[in-house]
Amino acid sequence: MQEETPSFLKKFCEDEWTKCSSEERITLIQLLSNYEAEKLGIPKVSVVSGRIDLVTLGYYDDEKNEIVVDIEHMREDSARDVTVTILHETYHAYQYYLAKNIDFNSEISKTAYFDTARSWRDNSLNYIDGHENREGYSAQPLEESARAFAQEEYKNLKPMIEE
């Protein structure tokens, strides 16, 4: 049985996105993050907007379980770019959720199946800030996985957005 396309996804079509106010956009972004969180099996993540800096489009704050999206990015960039940012940051919530909740001392977690989650946990303990080392930041397991997920998930969502 095929799931019905959530109606809010159609608002991420460029023609629709450009008609939305900042308030409408943050609501849509929250709905997108909720949708992805449910698919990933994690608690919902709060999404807020604010001015970050000149290079950061968004970030996930693990302590607050919150995504902050740069307000200029949200207002000025394409729906596609903002969608990819939210997918990327929601995936970080998933990564941190697993890193926090898996018992890495159990025998089962020592199997190869958990290698990726273990690498995320280790990376979260030794995270490289992109402002200090852009190359090191980009090569981290957390960032590589989130980028790959966001690109792949956008490909999956695109037909629903364009319906």
What are these regions (language model features)?
Residues 2-63:
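Auxiliary, metal-adjacent structural segments of Zn-dependent hydrolase domains
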